[in-house]
Amino acid sequence: MGKGGMNLIDASSWIEFLRGRGSEPSQRVKALLARGQAGWCEFTLVELWNGAQGQVEKKALEELESEVRLYSVNEQVWTKARLLARRSREKGITATSGDIVVAACAANYALNVEHCDSHFDKILPIAAKL
């Protein structure tokens, strides 16, 4: 969707990073943070806070909130999310509401999506055409 630059990071990759896993998604998040190219939306923050485990993870989230760019889930994003949900279902694709909102947000702001969730491989091409 985006052409280089900023990335909207999905909760799937944030969780890998926050839990200190040495996975590829965790390393990609680390690199995006170092380059100042990490972003998230309110929906992702809710998901992360809802699943935060222990004080170390909560402290890391608090610190990240002051340095990671927040992309608002505004009226345009919600409109794209509804359209993306409808078009995805028409193609027989089922994705979580959270993934739909993140993909719509990325489409709205022309951002890349960092993820480790197979739903995105199916819905991002649809979102790119919104």
Model-found features: residue ranges?
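Short active-site oxyanion
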Residues: 35-37, 67-69, 107-112
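Acidic catalytic patch
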Residues: 47, 68-90
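A generic structural signal for short hydrophobic patches within well-formed alpha-helices
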Residues: 14-15, 45-48, 120-121
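Short, well-structured N-terminal submotif of metal-dependent ribonuclease cores
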Residues: 1-40, 50-63
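Conserved glycosyltransferase catalytic-site signature
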Residues: 11, 42, 75, 97-100
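A general structural signal for well-ordered alpha-helical segments in protein cores
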Residues: 26, 45, 58-61, 78-81, ...
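Acidic, PIN/NYN-like endoribonuclease modules and their adjacent C-terminal/linker elements
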Residues: 1-6, 103-130
